[in-house]
């Protein structure tokens, strides 16, 4: 596995397992929204529901076209996230 995959896979897997809604921005500026259904080395399968059409669609998104993946909330189960920074204690000086 490539070194770059070591952060990407656990992050995407946590988004998938927790069914966290995401916004995926493509390099051409298009914003896609939905939940990550699956992914592999090259693609992300994004599941979206259209309220106006009352149906669910799945889109295959090639990773080389992705600029940014933005979760709608914090990801809790990613093992690569560092613990939150703590404020230094006041030593009274």
Curated annotation (Swiss-Prot):
GO terms for molecular function: RNA binding. GO terms for biological process: regulation of DNA-templated transcription; regulation of RNA stability; regulation of translation, ncRNA-mediated. Residues 9-75 form the Sm domain. The keyword Signal does not apply. Pfam families: Hfq (PF17209). Keywords: RNA-binding, Stress response. GO terms for cellular component: cytosol. The keyword Transmembrane does not apply. Residues 73-93 are annotated as: Disordered. InterPro entries: Hfq, LSM_dom_sf, Sm. RNA chaperone that binds small regulatory RNA (sRNAs) and mRNAs to facilitate mRNA translational regulation in response to envelope stress, environmental stress and changes in metabolite concentrations. Also binds with high specificity to tRNAs. Belongs to the Hfq family. PANTHER family: RNA-BINDING PROTEIN HFQ. Homohexamer. This is RNA-binding protein Hfq. The lineage of its organism: Bacteria, Pseudomonadati, Pseudomonadota, Gammaproteobacteria, Enterobacterales.
